[in-house]
């Protein structure tokens, strides 16, 4: 097994390929500014730029965490207990998708994980850690952890409100790190109406609302989205939207509709 580590400490440049570095850092900074997260970590089983190997033994980790925390994480060997890196983590399984999970659920059943999250909070990473699954059209899975500082809003309500957005953003990050380059061939499979439906779905519209906007029947919208799922090799609507976003088939939506 090999480990590729891409580190942008506190959203600053690092030693890595200039093109990948510039584009990815700009994306991560934009995501931070749009959703108000503190830090982003993305993990997937594969090598940087390889979007073809399913269940690879290799590991790529992309992060914006402070260098001081990364050093502490290493010295404490938190890797061994971090729920995102466990063999049975649900984010990488072939039979699961569209997961957005508050890691407090893991902390509630494992004291070691609770200690890890408490230590991370003490060091300024935030008090809410949300792990979000992602999968590219070839079936390669990944997981993004977004950290937030949430004080006034209930954690469950916050997660429910942000879930569609986080799933989309995790898909975009995953596609960027995997280096999927077949967007044109995938896009050519989709009809204009299928793309329209995906675009409005990304903006949080229901099937009925999309039907009204496009002046078509609701069942026609359902059919278009079902066809798009099949063409994008996705198991559900949320995953199809995230994949379309990650490949640049549709543009990233504004966040206002989730507020």
UniProtKB/Swiss-Prot annotation:
> Matching SMART domains, A to Z?
HTH_LUXR
* Residue span, HTH luxR-type domain: 183-248
Q: Does the keyword Transcription apply?
A: yes
Which cysteine pairs are covalently linked by disulfides here?
none
Q: What processes does the entry annotate via GO biological process terms?
A: quorum sensing; regulation of DNA-templated transcription
Please list the residue ranges the record marks as binding DNA.
Answer: 207-226
Q: Superkingdom of the source?
A: Bacteria
UniProt miscellaneous comment: As bacterial aggregation is one of the initial steps of biofilm formation, the clumping phenotype observed in the vjbR mutant suggests that B.melitensis might be able to form biofilms.
What PANTHER family does the annotation carry? DNA-BINDING TRANSCRIPTIONAL ACTIVATOR DEVR_DOSR
Q: What is this protein called?
A: HTH-type quorum sensing-dependent transcriptional regulator VjbR
